[in-house]
Amino acid sequence: MDENKKRALAAALSQIEKQFGKGSVMRMGDRVIEAVEVIPTGSLMLDIALGTGGLPKGRVVEIYGPESSGKTTLTLQAIAQCQKLGGTAAFIDAEHALDPVYAAKLGVNVDDLLLSQPDTGEQALEIADMLVRSSSVDIVVIDSVAALTPKAEIEGEMGDQLPGLQARLMSQALRKLTGNIKRSNTLVVFINQLRMKIGVMMPGQSPEVTTGGNALKFYASVRLDIRRIGAIKKGDEIIGNQTKIKVVKNKLAPPFKQVVTEILYGEGISREGELIDMGVEAKLVEKAGAWYSYGDERIGQGKDNARTYLRDNPQVAVRLEAELREKFQPAEAPREAGDDEEKE
């Protein structure tokens, strides 16, 4: 660059800093790129699939799937992990359906959890924005986008047609929220539901669509698709769901990874079940017929007994988890990958 251009650029940068503050514009080479801060999800498999060890702070995350697939369970376990690390968590319950007894079973300290049950979508998003701007909350969960009902719809008649109202509300809120989320380093998780598109579909195109328009798809750094794929039985009794979680979008690591984990009723994601499955995959746990062995010790006949053994011997589970993390998890979080999408 010639001297005249350099002087003009220096003058422009100086003017920008005077008007908007130091750091408004910077050279990428001058900025130290730090590893992304994360909040673990409570699922070792998912933490590894995300590539960064958890859900990234200072970002928007969307978790969507069919009913009873484990969306709220996953977010409550992330809240429990955040609280264990000394963080503050908020849950905006637009569905008015949070069960504090179940949350406590998943490890959430319900006495310290900030809970809001707003009347309208505008109120819910305004509360979320105020909590984010306080810079004192580590994770804010909004359950769910479908329940963020615009004020005009609540005040109107039952049959009123108000097309695009919720999509406009989400688009406006996310434009306002994203800058504050980055500055305050808060993780904001939106839980979303699925609907079916009505009309003729192109071959190979999915008829499923998430609620609340397209804005959230663009603003989210991570999108997780969670689905129940089978039942876990103990004899004839169903004790949980086999669940597939797919990383549909990831701006911080390679996307499209998927994991199959177990969600047990009243317990949440089975940590011991994940350790056994990953141990077998990594050849740290040996499976001979129905028997599972770790090291020189047999830990159980059948997965259920092996799971019980690890639960009763936490020191063995901790040792196995440490070995698995060393084998599967990258030494450091990767730098942020480029993103081709443009925000609308």
UniProtKB/Swiss-Prot annotation:
InterPro entries (alphabetical): AAA+_ATPase, DNA_recomb/repair_RecA, DNA_recomb/repair_RecA_CS, P-loop_NTPase, RecA-like_C, RecA-like_N, RecA_ATP-bd, RecA_C_sf
Example of a GO MF term: ATP hydrolysis activity
Binding site for ATP: 65-72
Keywords from the named record: ATP-binding, Cytoplasm, DNA damage, DNA recombination, DNA repair, DNA-binding, Nucleotide-binding, SOS response
Matches recorded under PROSITE patterns: RECA_1, RECA_2, RECA_3
Cysteines engaged in disulfide bonds, as pairs: none
Main location: cytoplasm
A GO cellular-component term linked to this record: cytosol
Function: Can catalyze the hydrolysis of ATP in the presence of single-stranded DNA, the ATP-dependent uptake of single-stranded DNA by duplex DNA, and the ATP-dependent hybridization of homologous single-stranded DNAs. It interacts with LexA causing its activation and leading to its autocatalytic cleavage.
Family classification: Belongs to the RecA family.
PANTHER family, A to Z: MITOCHONDRIAL DNA REPAIR PROTEIN RECA HOMOLOG-RELATED (PTHR45900:SF1), RECA (PTHR45900)
Protein name: Protein RecA
Species the sequence originates in: Xanthomonas oryzae pv. oryzae (strain KACC10331 / KXO85)
Gene: recA
